[in-house]
Amino acid sequence: HCQIEAVELDLLAAQQAQENFKASPWHNRLHLTHQDVQTYCQQTAHQFDLIVANPPYFAQGVECKNDERALARYVQQSHLDWLNWAASCLSEKGKISFVLPYEAGKTLINSTALYCIKQTDVITKIGKDPQRMLLTFSRENLPQVKDSLVIYDENNQYTEAFIALTKAFYLKM
């Protein structure tokens, strides 16, 4: 059985995650460290088979109501730095998956020494350009899989693909 290690910089988000962990049927396999990713990766001896993340990805913009919100939304480090720190914690065959804005994802794919083995372009509505990119990187040069995910159809209803992907996680699906 796998063990899941979460790393969260924001104290309130870490506390909420800890509460959620306690309520989980897998609570004994969930562990949380309140720390930034760079420090965690520099200090840990763990080598992970899979790292899944949603790092902050907005450039500084509209002022947030509080510092916690700004920390969660706005980029503090470059995406390439973040990826490199996480890669230092990867096992030999490990993978890193995360979400980025579409253009930032294209830039990262071209900037890293890791191989992008999966790219899913996320399209909010049929007929629109992709807004986000789900990416998976590996040290191994594996065949790349490219696909897309459309969230809403032309009638503003969730697509079958989106429902199939998220129904286990959304309460009102």
Locations of the language-model features?
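SAM/dcSAM-binding transferase cores
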Residues: K128-M173
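Conserved SAM/SAH cofactor-binding pocket of Class I
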Residues: H1-G61
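Conserved Class I SAM-dependent methyltransferase catalytic core
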Residues: Q77-P130, L134-T136
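Mobile active-site "lid"/loop adjacent to the S-adenosyl-L-methionine
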Residues: P55-D81
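Feature marks short, surface-exposed loop/turn motifs that line or immediately flank catalytic pockets
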Residues: A59, A104, N141
